[in-house]
C-alpha cells in the first residue's frame, strides 16, 4: 500500500491521534529523521541456540515488512520482503547467507509485503537464489476486484510470475505446524474470512505463532480489528499469548487493544518508518500533524507493561 493510500485509509478511521507520554514512545533505537541508514543494531532477545531474527527496514521511506529467520546452521526462512525497491537489497542479503531459502511465507496481498519477492522471481534463475516453497493464502481475485480494485492488477501480475516460476506453492491451513528443526516452528492461526469486506485485504493477513528455541513470537502481518477480534473470540488464549509481537498494520489502525491484551507481549517489533512513528503527515509537517493512530498504540503498550520495543527505522538482528 503506497503512502498516499495509507494516509487516505488512516483518515477514514480517525482524525488526529492523541499524544501520549514519552515513555510510551520509548524504543530501543530512534535515529534522527533524515539521517543516513545506520548499520544494523543487535540485541539479545531469545538467547541460547535460537535462530537469529533479521528485521529489515524498507529501502524507501514507505511502509513495508521484511523478516528473515536464520538458523545456527545457516538455514533460512523468510516472511514477506517489502516493496520491489527492496528486492535487490534483500536478494543480496539472502545470498550473503547462502542463497537457499527453505520457505517463504507471505502474509497477505499488499505490495509492501510481496513485491520484493515478485522482483526476485523476474530475474533469471531468481538471481541465483534457491527457494524451496512459497506459502500464501491470498484472497480470490474476483473478491479482490470487488473490495480493492486498485490492488487487482498488481496481485494478478505477481501470481502470474509465481505460477511461471515453477516454485512449489502451498496454502496454509489453520493449525498446520511448519517444523524447521533447530527449535523453530510456525503454526498457522487463521484463514481468510470473506465476510470481512471492510479493510478486507489487511484482514486476510495470515498470522503465525512462531516458536524459536522456547520463545514465542506472534507474526500479525496487517491484521485488522475485525480479524483480530475473531481470533480473540475463537482461539484459546495460549495460542495468542506470545513473548514477542509484531505490531499489526505497522503499528496503527490494525488490531485493537483487546487483541494485544490477549497476546500480552513482553517485547514488540514495530515495522514502522519514522514518519509514521511520529504521526507526521507526509513526513515533512512535524510530529502530530498526521491522521495516524500510532500514538494510541504506543499508549496501549505502555498500559500493558511491554518491556522492550524495537522500532524499524533501522535494521535489527535479534538473537
How would you label these PLM feature ranges?
Residues 62-63, 84-86, 109-115, 141-144, ...:
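Active-site environment of divalent metal-dependent phosphoester hydrolases
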Residues 29-99, 169-240, 316-319:
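Core dinuclear metal-dependent hydrolase active-site scaffold
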Residues 115-124, 145-152, 257-260:
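Metal-dependent catalytic neighborhoods of phosphoester/phosphodiester hydrolases
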Residues 74, 84-136, 234-252, 264-269:
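Active-site metal-binding motif and surrounding structural segment of the metallo-beta-lactamase
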Residues 5-27:
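N-terminal export signals
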Residues 133, 141-202, 267, 272-319:
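Binuclear metal-ion centers of metallo-dependent hydrolases, dominated by the metallo-beta-lactamase
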Residues 89, 115-119, 157, 230, ...:
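Extracytoplasmic/secreted proteins, especially bacterial periplasmic and envelope-associated proteins
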Amino acid at each position: 500500500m503506497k503512502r498516499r493510500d495509507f494516509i487516505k485509509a488512516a483518515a477514514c478511521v480517525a482524525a488526529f491521534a492523541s499524544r501520549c507520554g514519552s515513555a510510551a514512545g520509548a524504543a530501543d533505537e530512534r535515529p534522527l529523521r533524515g539521517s543516513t541508514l545506520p548499520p544494523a543494531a543487535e540485541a539479545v532477545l531469545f538467547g541460547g541456540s535460537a535462530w537469529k531474527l533479521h528485521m529489515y527496514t524498507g529501502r524507501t521511506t514507505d511502509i513495508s515488512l521484511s523478516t528473515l529467520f536464520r538458523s545456527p546452521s545457516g538455514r533460512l526462512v523468510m516472511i514477506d520482503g517489502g516493496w520491489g525497491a527492496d528486492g535487490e537489497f534483500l536478494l543480496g542479503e539472502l545470498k550473503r547467507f547462502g542463497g537457499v531459502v527453505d520457505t517463504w511465507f507471505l502474509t497477505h496481498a499488499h505490495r509492501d509485503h510481496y513485491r520484493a519477492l515478485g522482483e526476485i522471481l523476474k530475474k533469471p534463475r531468481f538471481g541465483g537464489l534457491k527457494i524451496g516453497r512459497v506459502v500464501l493464502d491470498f484472497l480470490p481475485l474476483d473478491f479482490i476486484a470487488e473490495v480493492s480494485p486498485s490492488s487487482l492488477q498488481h496481485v494478478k501480475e505477481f501470481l502470474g510470475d509465481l505460477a511461471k516460476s515453477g516454485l512449489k506453492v502451498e496454502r496454509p491451513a489453520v493449525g498446520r505446524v511448519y517444523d524447521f528443526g533447530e527449535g523453530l516452528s510456525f503454526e498457522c492461526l487463521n484463514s481468510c474470512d470473506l465476510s470481512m469486506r471492510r479493510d478486507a485485504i489487511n484482514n486476510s493477513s495470515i498470522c503465525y505463532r512462531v516458536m524459536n528455541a522456547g520463545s514465542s513470537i506472534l507474526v500479525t502481518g496487517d491484521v485488522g480489528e475485525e480479524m483480530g477480534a475473531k481470533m480473540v473470540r475463537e482461539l484459546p488464549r495460549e495460542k495468542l499469548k506470545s513473548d514477542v509481537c509484531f505490531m499489526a498494520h505497522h503499528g496503527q489502525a490494525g488490531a485493537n487493544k483487546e487483541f494485544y491484551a490477549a497476546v500480552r507481549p513482553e517485547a514488540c517489533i514495530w515495522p514502522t518508518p519514522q514518519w509514521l512513528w511520529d504521526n507526521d503527515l507526509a513526513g515533512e509537517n512535524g510530529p502530530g500533524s498526521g491522521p495516524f493512530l500510532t500514538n494510541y498504540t504506543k499508549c496501549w503498550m505502555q498500559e500493558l507493561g511491554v518491556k522492550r520495543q524495537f522500532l524499524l527505522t533501522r535494521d535489527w538482528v535479534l538473537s
